[in-house]
Amino acid sequence: MKLQRAASQFAAAVLALGVAACSPEADTSKTASTTPAVPVESFLGRWDLTLTSPDKEYPSWLELSQENGQLKAVMVGRWGNARPLPKVEITNGHLKFVSPKEEEGARSDMVFDGTLTGNTLSGTTSAPDGTMWTWTAVKAPGLKESGTPKWGKPIALFNGKDLSGWTMSKSDAKTVWKVEKGNLVTPGGGPELINDQKFQDFKLHVEFKCDPDSNSGVYLRGRYEVQIETDSPNDPPNRRIGSVYGFLAPSPDLPREPGKWQTYDITLIGRIITVMHDGKTIIDNQEIPGITGGALDSGEASPGPIYLQGSEKGHVYFRKIVITPTEPFNQ
């Protein structure tokens, strides 16, 4: 009998606790989330982004800014040039932006959703084929250098004979790079040609000529394209010959001169670039905001190779490619 009474009292106590826990007046302050929303300011700035599909990674770039309380976004997608995005919003620590289907070659817009954890943005996006891909992004490095650069010894990247020291991006390509009469020749619609060495800061001398209606480019650290073309007279100035593609336009605008040998002398320190064309400065000590379309990766803090674009149309010829890297800075 005493055992039954004790059991009844215990059951009543458990029931009372359950009712109290479910009551609107119950004190849940000790277990409620107290994590504050991530402020909008934490999202602002330049981001080096990597988009991951089931079989490939695509380097991309994103810049978020705010003007008069309105968010703005500029993006370099899987290819092409930097472009403003039509929609971007940050709500309760959640980022959403849209890359239009026309820019992505997709059936519908690519909608990016993501959150910020520590110093990393991550999330998902609707892929061109309708599946879901993932993406991550880290703040782009400032790449600010101080002191005076000390130049090392010049290195000839092309020996005038063969492709020694270079690797094509596709080993099974139907059209390939060739050496003809001492010149490197782009395949036209073929693979890229990537140098085997990696460099951080340097001076680069390149001699080239173009067939009519042709297109190529010189990629610095494998990430920043200095454009070469005779096929884009109607493009904006920052996509024509002499430009850092999609970002920096040459001044003055350069004529297209098929069949003529021309030179680039390029100096890249951090993300500050100077470009000379045939001995005349066309881009003077300007900042490259981020990677350009076709970059090998988005890891801007790391050294990277020189690569020559072969995936565009026509034929471009290179006969001299010499790089002079820096030695450690003198403080």
Region locations from a protein language model:
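C-terminal motif of bacterial Sec signal peptides marking the signal peptidase cleavage site
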Residues: 19-21
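Carbohydrate-interacting regions of secretory-pathway proteins
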Residues: 24-30, 35, 39-331
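Bacterial N-terminal signal peptides that target proteins for export
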Residues: 1-11
